[in-house]
Swiss-Prot record:
It catalyses: (2R)-2,3-dihydroxy-3-methylbutanoate + NADP(+) = (2S)-2-acetolactate + NADPH + H(+); (2R,3R)-2,3-dihydroxy-3-methylpentanoate + NADP(+) = (S)-2-ethyl-2-hydroxy-3-oxobutanoate + NADPH + H(+). Residues 2-181 form the KARI N-terminal Rossmann domain. GO terms for biological process: isoleucine biosynthetic process; L-valine biosynthetic process. It comes from the Bacteria. NCBIfam families: ilvC, PRK05479.1, PRK13403.1. Its EC number is 1.1.1.86. Mg(2+) 2 binds at D190, E226, E230. Binds 2 magnesium ions per subunit. Transmembrane segments: none annotated. It holds the Pfam family KARI_N. It comes from Staphylococcus haemolyticus (strain JCSC1435). This is Ketol-acid reductoisomerase (NADP(+)).
Length: 334
C-alpha cells in the first residue's frame, strides 16, 4: 500500500550542516532555492551568466558558475531542462563531484535512461514536486505545499533516503505529503501521462474535434468554443473533485452523452495504442529518439513544432481571445 510521509515522518534533519547547490534558476530552481533558504539552509545557485543568473543575485543568493557551485556543495540539485543536463553534467558537474556528495533531480529521465551515469561513491536521489515552480513557491509562502514524490537510485553513504526526505521537507513538500517511488516509476509514468493524456492525447483530441465540426460546415469560432475554450470549465471541475464532480455539475444531457458516446471515441483500440506508447517509453525507444534528435539540433522537434503552430485552431483562438479581456492572454514568441 502506498505510504505518504509528512513533516512528522522526517525524524532526522540530514541536510543540517550541508551546503546545497541548486543548478538552474528557472521554474523549479527558484522555488527550491527560496524555500530551502527560508527554512534556514545554506543554499547557493549554480548557473551560466544571463537573466536567471542576475535574477538569483537579486533574490539574495550567492551565484557561481556551475562547476564552482558543485565544488562548494555537499548536495547538488540539478534543475535544468532534460536536453541540456547531459552536457552540463559531463563538462561541469561530474569533474567536480566528490565522494559522499549527493546528486539530486526533480525528474528521473537522464538517470533512468543512463544519459547521466554518476560515480558509485555519490548518493543519487529524486524529489519531484507535482506542480510548477511558481505554485511550489506560492503555497510554501502561504503555509501549505504541493505534494511531491521522492526516491533513491543510489545510496553510497547510507544516508540517501534521509537526505531525500529532509530535502522534500526543506522545500515544504512534506506539509502536503510525499510518496516514495523509484526513478523508473517516476520517469515512465510522467512521460506516459504527458504523451498519452495531458499533452499528446488531449491536444490531438481537441484538434480532431475542431476539424470534425469545421469539416461538417459549422463555424470555426463555435467549434473553438465547444472543443477548446470550454475545456477549462471541465478541467477545473475535475481538478477540484475528480470525474464524479464533473458529472455532478453538468446537465443530464451532457452526462448521458458522456456515457454513451465517450466509449465510441475512446475505443479499446485507443487503449491498445496507449499500451504501445507506454512500451516505447519502457524500452527506451522514445528516450533514444529524443536524445538523438537533440544531438542533431532538434531538427525533427522544431519541424513538428512548426507544423502544430500552423494549425487553424490556433489562428481562430488568437482572434477569439481578443473578445475576452478577462482572459490573461499569453502571446507565444516563435
Amino acid at each position: 500500500m502506498t505510504k505518504v510521509y509528512y513533516d512528522q515522518s522526517v525524524e532526522k534533519d540530514a541536510l543540517q550542516g550541508k551546503k546545497i547547490a541548486i543548478i538552474g534558476y528557472g521554474s523549479q530552481g527558484h522555488a527550491h532555492a527560496q524555500n530551502l533558504k527560508d527554512n534556514g539552509y545554506d543554499v547557493i545557485v549554480g548557473i551560466r551568466p544571463g537573466h536567471s543568473f542576475d535574477k538569483a543575485k537579486e533574490d539574495g543568493f550567492d551565484v557561481y558558475p556551475v562547476a564552482e557551485a558543485v565544488k562548494q556543495a555537499d548536495v547538488i540539485m540539478v534543475l535544468l531542462p532534460d536536453e541540456i543536463q547531459g552536457n552540463v553534467y559531463k563538462n561541469e558537474i561530474e569533474p567536480n563531484l566528490e565522494a559522499g556528495n549527493a546528486l539530486a533531480f526533480a525528474h528521473g529521465f537522464n538517470i533512468h535512461f543512463e544519459v547521466i551515469k554518476p560515480p558509485k561513491d555519490v548518493d543519487v536521489f529524486l524529489v519531484a514536486p507535482k506542480g510548477p515552480g511558481h505554485l511550489v513557491r506560492r503555497t510554501f509562502v502561504e503555509g501549505t505545499a504541493v505534494p511531491a514524490l521522492f526516491g533513491v537510485q543510489q545510496d553510497a553513504t547510507g544516508q540517501a533516503r534521509d537526505i531525500s526526505l529532509s530535502y522534500a521537507k526543506g522545500i515544504g513538500a512534506t506539509r502536503a505529503g510525499v510518496i516514495e517511488t523509484t526513478f523508473k516509476e517516476e520517469t515512465e509514468t510522467d512521460l506516459f501521462g504527458e504523451q498519452a493524456v495531458l499533452c499528446g492525447g488531449i491536444h490531438k483530441l481537441i484538434q480532431s474535434g475542431f476539424e470534425t465540426l469545421v469539416e461538417a460546415g459549422y463555424q470555426k469560432e463555435l467549434a473553438y468554443f465547444e472543443v477548446l475554450h470550454e475545456m477549462k470549465l471541465i478541467v477545473d471541475l475535475m481538478y477540484e473533485g475528480g470525474m464524479e464532480n464533473v458529472r455532478y455539475s453538468i446537465s443530464n444531457t451532457a452526462e448521458y452523452g458522456d456515457y454513451v458516446s465517450g466509449p465510441r471515441v475512446i475505443t479499446p483500440d485507443v487503449k491498445d495504442n496507449m499500451k504501445a506508447v507506454l512500451k516505447d517509453i519502457q524500452n527506451g525507444n522514445f528516450a533514444n529518439s529524443f536524445v538523438k534528435d537533440n544531438e542533431n539540433g532538434f531538427k525533427e522537434f522544431y519541424k513538428l513544432r512548426e507544423q502544430q503552430h500552423g494549425h487553424e485552431i490556433e489562428a481562430v483562438g488568437r482572434e477569439l481571445r481578443k473578445m475576452m479581456p478577462f482572459i490573461k492572454s499569453k502571446s507565444i514568441q516563435k
